[in-house]
Amino acid sequence: MDLIADHISHRFGGLDVLDDVSFTVASGEVVAIVGPSGCGKSTLLSILGGLLRPSEGRAELRGAPPDNSLNPLTFVFQDFALLPWCTVEANVEFPLVHTALDAAARQAVVDDALRRTGLSDFRGAYPKQLSGGMRQRVGIARALAVRPAILLMDEPLSALDSQTRELLMEDFVRLLADGTMGAVYITHNLEEAVRLADRVVVLSRRPGRVREVVSIPMTRAERGGIDARGKLLTLQNQLWSLIREEAIDAEREVQHA
């Protein structure tokens, strides 16, 4: 397995946020994480990426701590976090500047990342000159430049309009098609989850536990066809029912506290 979450629990002060969360991400697999608000999804992603140490349990990337530079992973957030004074090309190159790559090798990696995200013709543009969707593409290209084993994505499309979100979902499908890179994808949008993921991990209300793991029985290419729409909608409804049950139970607990 590329990525392992092994009995992860976490608390902030006296507040339990995650409780005994375990799952795996195989090489080239995409796992979506969904659940009610406040269930610890972003906290879990920070632990998987080595930004936060769990109170209990462990995360491993190819048998080593996730912040081990030999097994790179990288984040794509809702906030693009681009350097406004740098061009698109310079933003994509930024994470490579202090690596062992020489200038020619860095340029080759940047060129490839720009090509894969459709940004080759925008390399000289500045972030303020780009739409929200294009800025998010720059963020994705920057993530791809480090050649990650795992891409960690936290609501990467939530700030975008529906048309741009659809275009970027198609981009993600294309980028993940060769199976060389896995991903963990946090989203509130269940359509995104069933379109992009191989499996969906449903977390319970806080403290987040694994309520259920739902497998998507189609390839991502098959999900784009008209015949798949009914099956995908059924899966969305299944996920929504699970999350709704957790949200209702959480509200009852508050009322009886």
Where are these regions (language model features)?
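The feature captures the beta-strand-to-loop junction immediately N-terminal to the Walker
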Residues: 34-36
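Helix-to-loop junction immediately C-terminal to a conserved catalytic motif
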Residues: 49
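Conserved ABC transporter NBD signature motif
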Residues: 57-68
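Short coil-to-helix segment of the ABC ATPase nucleotide-binding domain corresponding to the Q-loop/switch region
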Residues: 86-94
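Conserved ABC ATPase "signature" region
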Residues: 97, 104-122, 174
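Conserved ABC ATPase signature
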Residues: 126-130, 134
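A short, proline-enriched helix->beta-strand linker immediately N-terminal to the Walker B motif
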Residues: 145-149
